[in-house]
Amino acid sequence: MTSPLLRIMIDAALAAGEEIERIYAEGCAAEEKLDGSPVTIADRHAELIILERLARDFTDIPVLAEEEACAGRIPELGARFFCVDPLDGTKGFVARTGEFTVNIALIENEEAIAGVIYAPDPRLLYYGARGEGAFRAEHKVEAEPIRVRPRPATGLIGVGSRNHAAPGTEERNARLGIKDYLPSGSSLKFCRLAEGAADVYPRHGRTMEWDTAAGQAILEAAGGRVMVLDGDAEAGPLRYGKIEDGFANPNFIAWGG
């Protein structure tokens, strides 16, 4: 049974997804933000919808949202806040790959404890929360539970970005024992681990908290974990609310089983 809080997060993601679908069908151009990343009218419209939905039901929980944060509008964050990426994978949206998502997470005491990821094309929903498990629902089909797969002794399946391969990726993959590689865009990489389609997602390169929070919550609810990397060594779970770092993440590795 889905908790009321998670249900509201799901409804907000679906509403934002509907607006993204509408704009996707019409087509739109991307602009460049100060950090060089792309943004479209779909990002902005979707974020407004999510902010309005969450504010209606959770007046006491602040929201860290990507476009607001990039514009310098950062609320005072307490121990509990929402972390939102209204359109993760804007490059995929503009290129019409279908690999873009709406990400909404709830953070509590620096940990991602609940998350929703919605892919408007092909209308695929993932969600999960601590103590509730993780689920996947296709369009108009009842949700089914998902779980990471047991880690194989050899021949790991790795997942990673189509657009952001860091220098040394092939060498690191070899050290991890990755034999097959599943390229994937946006936060869907975490979903591939959570549903047992892949085993490991090493990330060396720029990500922000809103890129990873929902995916981490879903993956951990499915039995996986996300760990900070210090070189090749794991150095504790990935945490949130890193305002002193501009909400940027360090290198990390996400594991399925």
Task: Describe these PLM feature segments.
Residues 29, 62, 157, 177-180, ...:
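Conserved beta-strand segments of alpha/beta enzyme cores
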Residues 1-87, 167, 171-174, 191, ...:
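N-terminal subdomain of lithium-sensitive/metallo-dependent phosphomonoesterases centered on the IMPase/IPPase/PAP
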Residues 20, 43, 54, 90, ...:
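Residue-level signal for inorganic ion chemistry
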Residues 33, 66, 161, 184, ...:
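Conserved beta-strand termini and adjacent loop/short-helix elements that scaffold enzyme active sites
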Residues 1-11, 17, 170-175, 191-257:
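Oxyanion/phosphate-interacting regions
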Residues 78-122:
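Glycine-rich active-site/cofactor-binding loop and its immediate structural neighborhood
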Residues 69, 97, 118, 131, ...:
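Residue-level structural signal for beta-strand termini and adjacent loop
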Residues 104-191, 238-257:
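Acidic beta-strand-loop-alpha-helix segment within the catalytic core
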